[in-house]
Structures are given as C-alpha cells and as structure tokens.
Amino acid sequence: MESCFQGDSRKSYSLSELAEILGAAVRGDPAIRIRGVNSLEDALPDELSFITDVRYKPLLSKCRAAAIIVSPALAELEFPLLVAERPYVVFARAAQLFAEPPFLAPGVHPGAYIGPNVHLGEGVSVGPQAHIGEDCVVGPGTRIYGSAYLGPGVRVGENCMLYPGAVILDRCLLGNRVTVHSGTVVGSDGFGYAQDEKGRHVKIPQTGIVQIDDDVEIGANCTVDRATFGRTWVRRGAKIDNQVQIAHNVVIGEHAILVAQVGISGSTTLGSHVVLAGQVGVAGHIEIGDRARVGAKSGVHHSVGAGEDILGIPGVPAREWKRTYANIQRLARFREELRLLVEKVQRIEKALDGE
C-alpha cells in the first residue's frame, strides 16, 4: 500500500540525516535512504515506521520497512533503527518532513476576489473563488484555498493554511502557522440575548473579535464565536478537533486539546494543557485549571482545579465517579441481599410475635 505520508518522490533522507534532524541515534546502516513513513504493516522497503510497545514486536516478522523508530528499551532489535526517548514524537516529526500540503498554485488565482487595501505577503497563494475582504493583511507563505472567506480587516500571520470553505469573519486575528480546516467559522456572533418584560429576546450585538495565536490547528466544521466585548481567545499551540463549539469570550489555554463535539459555554477559561475528551459539555463562567482532564461525555458545571481528572454527569473527581460506578454495578446484588435480609427480619419478628 502506498504511504499516505510519502511526499515528493525526490525528497529523501539518509538514516544518519534523519537522526541528526530528529535528535535520534542510529543503529544499523546510516546510509539507508528513507522516502516516506508508514505503519508497521504497510511500510515499503524505502519507508520509516515506528514501534512504541513490545506487544507489537510480532509484527516485525512481516515488516518491510527500511528502518524503525524505537525507544531505548527496544534498541536491541535486529533491524535498522532510530532510537529516541519519545519514538512517537520523533515519528510525528519525521512525517512532517515527508508530508506535502494539498497542491495550491502559487500566486492569486484569477477567480479569487481581492478587496481594496489588501496586503498579501511574499509567497501567498490564493485559490479560486476565495474572498479576501478590504483591509485584510495576509502574512508570507500563507495558503488560502478555494472558497475560503476572509472578512474585512482580518489579519492572518505567516505560513497559515486556510482550507476550502474556511470562514474568518471581520476583524479576527490569526497568528503564525495557524491551520483552519474546511467548514469552520471563526468570528460568528456569540449567543447573547436579553429578555424583556414580555419574554421577547433582545439581541446583544457581539462587537468583539476572535484572536487565534501561533501554532493553533482547528478541525473541520467548528464554530468559534466572537466576543460580546473584547476577544474570544485561542492561545498558542491549542489543538481543536472537528465539530467543536467555542462560545463568546471563552479563553482556551496554551496547548489545550479539545476532542470532537466538545461544547464550551460563554466566558469560560481553560488553562494550559487542558484535555477535554469527546462530547464534553462545559458550563459558562467557570475555570478549568492547568493540566486538568475531563473524560468523554462528561458535563462540567463548576470550576475544576489544576491537574484534576473529571468524569460523569455532573462531572465529579474521577476517583469518586469510579467508586460510584462500581457501586452501580453491584446494585442488583445489593437488592437481592436486602430482599433476603428483609425476609429474615420478617421471620424473626413473626417468631417473636408468636411467643
């Protein structure tokens, strides 16, 4: 099977070159040429693969890879190796060396719309039917694919990737190396209404912006609402999966991970390295501390301290939830034991009444 991480066929590295670039040690022939990366099962004779656990050693008997990335614990394998403390991280960086972004012709496609007072940096590529509104600034090396939309006054940094159909609405700010995938809308109105005396909903204009810092990646079909005032802020290095909703005035901390279908209500703040697993719901106006983790489908209704693990609906500390769940699993047994105990008490009472 052809590697999905194999780039330009002219791009290749020797094992020793990769070791130097990736900070790994070579075991075996340093002159081996590598032209891509792949899984153990599918790797071709000129590709690099990886193994992180001894459980996968049986796969090596059929592996055709030119070399394998391993941890020091597996450095004695009879195979050309790159040895690193964090083999999975090294594999990810190797994949980046070979991966090529989807093709986009350099320059501005004649079918794109470029508004007045737009500044495009050196090496910017703009695809067909893309729309770049007035007063936008786009940094060098950024790729704006077909049908992407930038509203008036948007600022986009260097080497960003805006995929087809990505929407960045007016005045929003993107840092450097930001990736926004198809169907995502950055800067839609926050959900803000006041109820009058007759129960009618009066819209509160959402006049703030969204600020996305360097090295953020946002998946497909996400929505990041603009602030009521000030900014909704996604801080440096955060990674956001598909179909995530981030409400107005939310702050996402540095290097946070938000897995698919997470929803975060307004004015909530996440610390750095927070992990929200799939379908987590977070109430508004609370704080989740640095390195806290919330398990899938949990509902968080109160602030969470740094380093806490949360599970369940409503979310509680993981140990408490596990104890509760274990007891739920025993309910049928408890019920039967209680029934027998009640019957025993009734027999004793009946015997006592007969004396």
From Swiss-Prot:
Gene Ontology molecular functions: N-acyltransferase activity
Keywords on record: Acyltransferase, Lipid A biosynthesis, Lipid biosynthesis, Lipid metabolism, Repeat, Transferase
PROSITE patterns named among the record's database cross-references: HEXAPEP_TRANSFERASES (PS00101)
Spans through the membrane: none
Pathway given in the UniProt record: Bacterial outer membrane biogenesis; LPS lipid A biosynthesis
Catalytic center residues: H248 (proton acceptor)
SUPFAM superfamilies named in the record: Trimeric LpxA-like enzymes
Statement: the UniProt record of this protein carries the keyword Lipid biosynthesis: yes
Catalytic activity: a UDP-3-O-[(3R)-3-hydroxyacyl]-alpha-D-glucosamine + a (3R)-hydroxyacyl-[ACP] = a UDP-2-N,3-O-bis[(3R)-3-hydroxyacyl]-alpha-D-glucosamine + holo-[ACP] + H(+)
InterPro entries per UniProt: Hexapep, Hexapep_transf_CS, LpxD, Trimer_LpxA-like_sf, UDP_GlcNAc_AcTrfase_non-rep
Subunit composition and interactions: Homotrimer.
Protein name as annotated: UDP-3-O-acylglucosamine N-acyltransferase
The species this protein was found in: Syntrophobacter fumaroxidans (strain DSM 10017 / MPOB)
Gene coding for it: lpxD
